[in-house]
Amino acid sequence: MQIRIENQLKFLAIADSMKQVFRQTTLIDGSRYENDAEHSWHFALTAMTLFEYCVLDGVDINRVIKMAIVHDLVEIFAGDTPAMDTSANISKEEREREAADKLFALLPEEQAHEYRSLWEEFDAMETPNAIYAAAVDRFQSFYSIHMSGTGSAWVKFNATSERVRTRMLPLKTAIPSLWQWVENAINENISKGLIIK
Protein backbone atom coordinates (compact mmCIF):
# COMPACT_ATOMS: atom_id res chain seq x y z
CA MET A 1 0.00 0.00 0.00
CA GLN A 2 2.73 2.48 0.95
CA ILE A 3 4.76 1.89 -2.22
CA ARG A 4 1.59 2.14 -4.31
CA ILE A 5 0.59 5.52 -2.90
CA GLU A 6 4.16 6.82 -3.11
CA ASN A 7 4.24 5.92 -6.81
CA GLN A 8 0.88 7.60 -7.38
CA LEU A 9 2.04 10.74 -5.59
CA LYS A 10 5.23 10.76 -7.68
CA PHE A 11 3.09 10.47 -10.83
CA LEU A 12 0.91 13.38 -9.69
CA ALA A 13 3.97 15.55 -9.04
CA ILE A 14 5.25 14.83 -12.55
CA ALA A 15 1.76 15.44 -14.00
CA ASP A 16 1.92 18.93 -12.49
CA SER A 17 4.55 19.65 -15.15
CA MET A 18 1.72 19.94 -17.70
CA LYS A 19 1.37 23.48 -16.40
CA GLN A 20 4.81 24.20 -17.90
CA VAL A 21 4.18 22.71 -21.36
CA PHE A 22 3.10 25.63 -23.52
CA ARG A 23 1.16 25.25 -26.74
CA GLN A 24 1.02 27.43 -29.86
CA THR A 25 -2.55 28.47 -29.04
CA THR A 26 -3.10 31.69 -27.15
CA LEU A 27 -5.66 32.30 -24.47
CA ILE A 28 -8.82 33.91 -25.82
CA ASP A 29 -7.69 37.27 -24.43
CA GLY A 30 -4.47 36.88 -26.47
CA SER A 31 -2.30 37.72 -23.45
CA ARG A 32 -0.16 34.57 -23.56
CA TYR A 33 0.04 31.02 -24.81
CA GLU A 34 -2.03 28.42 -22.99
CA ASN A 35 -0.42 25.45 -21.30
CA ASP A 36 -1.39 21.79 -21.62
CA ALA A 37 -3.17 21.72 -18.25
CA GLU A 38 -5.35 24.68 -19.21
CA HIS A 39 -6.07 23.13 -22.60
CA SER A 40 -7.04 19.78 -21.05
CA TRP A 41 -9.38 21.47 -18.58
CA HIS A 42 -11.02 23.58 -21.32
CA PHE A 43 -11.30 20.49 -23.56
CA ALA A 44 -13.11 18.57 -20.76
CA LEU A 45 -15.44 21.50 -20.06
CA THR A 46 -16.17 21.95 -23.77
CA ALA A 47 -16.94 18.21 -24.12
CA MET A 48 -19.46 18.45 -21.28
CA THR A 49 -21.01 21.69 -22.52
CA LEU A 50 -21.45 20.64 -26.16
CA PHE A 51 -22.34 16.99 -25.52
CA GLU A 52 -26.04 17.55 -26.27
CA TYR A 53 -25.08 18.26 -29.91
CA CYS A 54 -23.11 15.04 -30.41
CA VAL A 55 -24.78 12.84 -33.05
CA LEU A 56 -22.60 9.76 -32.52
CA ASP A 57 -24.23 6.73 -30.88
CA GLY A 58 -22.73 5.17 -27.77
CA VAL A 59 -20.59 8.06 -26.55
CA ASP A 60 -19.81 7.84 -22.82
CA ILE A 61 -19.18 11.42 -21.69
CA ASN A 62 -17.36 10.24 -18.56
CA ARG A 63 -14.85 8.32 -20.69
CA VAL A 64 -14.44 11.35 -22.97
CA ILE A 65 -13.67 13.54 -19.94
CA LYS A 66 -11.06 11.01 -18.80
CA MET A 67 -9.55 11.14 -22.29
CA ALA A 68 -9.44 14.93 -22.08
CA ILE A 69 -7.53 14.72 -18.82
CA VAL A 70 -4.92 12.19 -20.01
CA HIS A 71 -4.64 12.86 -23.76
CA ASP A 72 -1.71 15.30 -23.54
CA LEU A 73 0.06 13.91 -20.45
CA VAL A 74 2.75 12.42 -22.71
CA GLU A 75 3.73 15.95 -23.74
CA ILE A 76 5.38 16.33 -20.33
CA PHE A 77 8.24 14.29 -21.82
CA ALA A 78 7.54 14.55 -25.57
CA GLY A 79 6.76 18.28 -25.74
CA ASP A 80 3.87 19.88 -27.59
CA THR A 81 3.58 19.16 -31.29
CA PRO A 82 1.52 21.88 -32.98
CA ALA A 83 -1.01 20.40 -35.40
CA MET A 84 -0.02 22.83 -38.15
CA ASP A 85 3.73 22.12 -37.80
CA THR A 86 4.25 19.48 -40.49
CA SER A 87 7.95 18.91 -39.74
CA ALA A 88 7.40 18.33 -35.99
CA ASN A 89 4.61 15.86 -36.73
CA ILE A 90 7.05 13.52 -38.51
CA SER A 91 8.56 12.32 -35.21
CA LYS A 92 5.47 12.84 -33.04
CA GLU A 93 4.30 9.22 -32.83
CA GLU A 94 7.70 7.86 -31.78
CA ARG A 95 8.34 10.65 -29.24
CA GLU A 96 4.91 10.24 -27.69
CA ARG A 97 5.12 6.42 -27.47
CA GLU A 98 8.45 6.69 -25.66
CA ALA A 99 6.96 9.32 -23.34
CA ALA A 100 3.93 7.10 -22.64
CA ASP A 101 6.20 4.18 -21.74
CA LYS A 102 8.12 6.37 -19.29
CA LEU A 103 5.15 8.22 -17.77
CA PHE A 104 2.59 5.46 -17.34
CA ALA A 105 5.20 3.08 -15.88
CA LEU A 106 5.14 5.28 -12.76
CA LEU A 107 1.59 4.14 -11.94
CA PRO A 108 0.36 0.87 -10.41
CA GLU A 109 -0.22 -1.68 -13.16
CA GLU A 110 -4.02 -1.40 -13.47
CA GLN A 111 -3.93 2.41 -13.49
CA ALA A 112 -1.07 2.40 -15.99
CA HIS A 113 -3.17 0.16 -18.22
CA GLU A 114 -6.28 2.35 -17.85
CA TYR A 115 -4.49 5.63 -18.56
CA ARG A 116 -2.53 4.22 -21.47
CA SER A 117 -5.61 2.64 -23.01
CA LEU A 118 -7.45 5.99 -22.75
CA TRP A 119 -4.51 7.72 -24.43
CA GLU A 120 -4.22 5.07 -27.16
CA GLU A 121 -7.98 5.07 -27.82
CA PHE A 122 -7.95 8.85 -28.17
CA ASP A 123 -4.91 8.76 -30.44
CA ALA A 124 -6.36 6.05 -32.71
CA MET A 125 -9.61 8.01 -33.14
CA GLU A 126 -11.62 4.91 -34.10
CA THR A 127 -14.32 4.61 -31.41
CA PRO A 128 -17.31 6.97 -31.03
CA ASN A 129 -15.79 8.21 -27.74
CA ALA A 130 -12.47 8.99 -29.41
CA ILE A 131 -14.07 10.64 -32.44
CA TYR A 132 -16.13 12.92 -30.21
CA ALA A 133 -13.08 13.61 -28.04
CA ALA A 134 -10.94 14.45 -31.08
CA ALA A 135 -13.65 16.71 -32.45
CA VAL A 136 -13.87 18.64 -29.19
CA ASP A 137 -10.08 18.75 -28.70
CA ARG A 138 -9.64 20.28 -32.13
CA PHE A 139 -12.62 22.59 -31.72
CA GLN A 140 -11.28 23.92 -28.40
CA SER A 141 -8.01 24.94 -30.04
CA PHE A 142 -9.76 26.32 -33.12
CA TYR A 143 -12.19 28.28 -30.97
CA SER A 144 -9.42 29.79 -28.83
CA ILE A 145 -7.36 30.83 -31.84
CA HIS A 146 -10.38 32.31 -33.60
CA MET A 147 -11.72 34.15 -30.56
CA SER A 148 -8.30 35.59 -29.70
CA GLY A 149 -8.12 37.30 -33.08
CA THR A 150 -4.36 36.64 -33.16
CA GLY A 151 -4.29 33.70 -35.54
CA SER A 152 -1.43 32.39 -33.33
CA ALA A 153 -0.59 28.91 -34.67
CA TRP A 154 -2.27 29.53 -38.03
CA VAL A 155 -0.04 32.51 -38.74
CA LYS A 156 3.13 30.93 -37.34
CA PHE A 157 2.79 27.79 -39.48
CA ASN A 158 1.23 29.41 -42.59
CA ALA A 159 -1.97 27.38 -42.25
CA THR A 160 -4.11 27.09 -45.35
CA SER A 161 -7.89 26.88 -45.24
CA GLU A 162 -7.62 23.34 -46.63
CA ARG A 163 -5.34 22.23 -43.76
CA VAL A 164 -7.57 23.86 -41.16
CA ARG A 165 -10.73 22.31 -42.65
CA THR A 166 -9.10 18.88 -42.84
CA ARG A 167 -8.00 19.17 -39.22
CA MET A 168 -11.57 19.99 -38.20
CA LEU A 169 -13.28 17.09 -40.05
CA PRO A 170 -13.97 15.04 -36.88
CA LEU A 171 -16.20 17.93 -35.77
CA LYS A 172 -18.25 17.60 -38.96
CA THR A 173 -18.80 13.93 -38.07
CA ALA A 174 -19.47 14.29 -34.34
CA ILE A 175 -21.13 17.72 -34.05
CA PRO A 176 -22.33 18.66 -37.54
CA SER A 177 -24.46 21.50 -36.17
CA LEU A 178 -21.22 23.40 -35.42
CA TRP A 179 -19.75 22.97 -38.90
CA GLN A 180 -21.28 26.13 -40.39
CA TRP A 181 -19.92 28.15 -37.46
CA VAL A 182 -16.44 26.73 -38.20
CA GLU A 183 -16.79 27.52 -41.92
CA ASN A 184 -17.81 31.09 -41.11
CA ALA A 185 -14.86 31.46 -38.71
CA ILE A 186 -12.43 30.09 -41.33
CA ASN A 187 -13.74 32.55 -43.91
CA GLU A 188 -13.50 35.42 -41.42
CA ASN A 189 -9.87 34.50 -40.66
CA ILE A 190 -9.07 34.26 -44.37
CA SER A 191 -10.42 37.79 -44.83
CA LYS A 192 -8.23 38.99 -41.92
CA GLY A 193 -5.16 37.35 -43.47
CA LEU A 194 -4.73 34.90 -40.56
CA ILE A 195 -5.44 31.79 -42.66
CA ILE A 196 -4.17 31.39 -46.22
CA LYS A 197 -6.94 30.81 -48.73
Task: Describe every region a protein language model picked out.
Residues 1-197:
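Alpha-helical, largely C-terminal catalytic domains
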